[in-house]
Regions:
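ADP-ribose/adenylate-binding Rossmann-like module
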Residues: 29, 33, 42-63
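Residue-level detector of anion-binding/catalytic polar loops
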Residues: 26, 51, 79
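Rossmann-fold NAD(P)-binding glycine/threonine-rich loop
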Residues: 38, 56-78
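Active-site-lining helix/loop region of Rossmann-like oxidoreductase modules
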Residues: 100-192
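Rossmann-fold dehydrogenase core element
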Residues: 69-85, 105-109
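A short helix-to-beta-strand connector/capping loop
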Residues: 2-6, 76-78
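Gly/Ser/Thr-rich loops at beta-strand to alpha-helix junctions
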Residues: 59-61, 84-92, 116
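Conserved Rossmann-fold cofactor-binding substructure of NAD(P)-dependent oxidoreductases
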Residues: 5-26, 30-37
């Protein structure tokens, strides 16, 4: 077995974050809201060439992170990887496997989760509230939330989605049963 040293720092303590980042290779952060606690952490990782991984489901934070830190991260070799949690990973890997099996892209895919255990963390609830407040306060944030390509490096390169929208209704599906929306689907469509 391999022993890994673990360093812990409060995200709102800039000096502690800086010290921690200077002494690590990979930083994993698992608590939001990232819009409150993540900017200086991503910035420090980008500056020091440290890889960064989070569970973020906040479109405004990720867009801001890309806009503010991509060039620096690219120059230092830091890999900034957002959205590595349940919100997106099963859909992302599922889409990759589906594409590899079919050998062609799809115009539309719906994912159904049969059984789900657990709950929503307080950090996720607070993150949702922060995103909602930001969207009400800033029309650009609201516009980005409704743009399925808001996190894409080239938003105009994606297919046109005229007439398509997220399906938020509860309905019966033949062979499946009753289905409803995944509460993170609006975010998930931006990263998968």
């Amino acid at each position: 077995t391999q022993h890994w040293d673990i360093a812990i720092a409060a995200a709102d303590d800039g000096d502690a974050v800086e010290h921690m980042v200077e002494h690590t290779k990979v930083l994993i952060t698992v608590i939001g809201p990232y819009s409150l606690y993540g900017d200086n952490v991503v910035a420090a990782c980008a500056r020091h060439g440290v890889d960064y991984v989070d569970l973020c489901g906040e479109v405004p934070f990720i867009r801001r992170s890309i806009d503010s830190h991509h060039a620096v991260a690219e120059s230092t070799g830091a890999r900034i990887v957002h959205s590595c949690g349940f919100d997106s990973v099963p859909s992302d890997i599922g889409m990759l496997n589906l594409y590899q099996a079919a050998g062609k892209p799809f115009a539309r895919v719906q994912m159904v989760v049969d059984k789900l255990k657990g709950g929503i963390s307080p950090g996720t609830i607070e993150s949702s509230l922060q995103v909602s407040h930001a969207a009400h306060a800033d029309k650009d944030v609201a516009r980005n939330l409704h743009n399925p390509y808001s996190l894409d490096p080239d938003p105009k390169a994606g297919p046109r989605l005229d007439g398509l929208q997220n399906d938020f209704e509860i309905k019966e599906v033949d062979g499946v049963g009753w289905v409803g929306p995944f509460f993170m689907s609006m975010f998930n469509t931006r990263v998968v």
